[in-house]
Amino acid sequence: MAPQANQDLQHGAFRQYLPDLSTPRFTTIAQNDAYGHARELKDKHAPPWLHGLYVHWRKLFEEPFKGITNDGVVRPGLFKLRDEGVPIERIVAAAQAVVGQLTPAQASKTILHIDSPEWRSWSNPEFLLSDKGIRLDEIAPSLRDGVLAVLRETLSPEGYDKAVGAMRINHFLGELVNARRVMNEHSYNFVLFGAAPSTTRPWGFSFYGHHLCLSVFLYKTQIVVSPWFTGAEPNLIDAGPYKGTHILDVEERLGLRLMQSLSAETQDKARVYRLMKDPAMPKGRWNHDDQRQLCGAYRDNRVVPYEGVTVSSLGAEQQGLVVQIIEQYLLYLPARARALRLEDVKAVFDETYFSWIGGSGDDDAFYFRIQSPVIIVEFDHHSGVFLTNGEPAKFHIHTVLRTPNAGDYGWALRGQIDGALNQDYVWEG
């Protein structure tokens, strides 16, 4: 069977894992909106493992931002101001149109200081853990369309399509489990950072919700889309008006192809754990919600040591596959910015590591990470959260991109912008 045909069968297998909607978990979520659902976690500590993670996240949030590193030391001088050809005038016009529609109450929750720590309070679970900004399923259609126009003008066309695909799949999941008021195509929050959208001063926005979280920093014609999280459960819509929508399959196919192309000896070096939940993993290497991923929500200062094999030690074919994988992870960026970032990544291939967890057969679930001083990308097959598969399956995927060494949220660029860090911001609390 052709690999892609096999992949399509694997992604479509989710229907055998649909949950029993008569159980208390699903009868409760069916009655709740986003705020009631969040109270289940915050007040009733349900589920307890996610509440425990949430408490840990809030402790991490209290730390000053430093950035992800491989050894605890931020490496300076990796990121420079430059012209990336971003259509800043169009992006600003779209954002100004949104600002013009906000009520005073909406504006007070939506327009935050450029240095607000709330940049870092995004998260992937469907629980609304950080209620800031405007929520798309609660606002007027014209304002919602305006927010989507900001995304459309900011992202590449293919990146925008990917984001919309994630949102539509989230809606599909909400229909599958009768949780439409918690998970739908517009169950996402939008927040602006900066005094005002500007063609000459730094600003940005956060767009976040279940399985799609984008952090966007803009300065003149330069853009940073990092960190971001994109996931799907399932990653394929097999019925309804958006039947055939699928995401994250290219990354999956390329990652497996790369691992399978390595010699047995090199595979052994790349594979840091043989099992997806391996007894050899140290405490904290796996948790119920992040599972194998290290660089998700609130992990802004994590130390992630290099593992696996260096990309520079691989052959030309394998290095080409690494480039193709990175291109998929840079898909949200407009074309010129993407090309420049890709050159940044290729320039440090001698410091870039590829690592793997799990099997590498056509039917195996797996995790991989590509990590360097300038980029971290993670791919992870997950067990069910709403679906009932107890083991990781190919139809539930989480992906993350980070820019280490203070590159996230455009932080490494801010000190290079005149006056950007000379603020009189009064920190709350």
Model-derived features: positions:
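A cross-kingdom marker for long, charged
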Residues: 2-156, 161-429
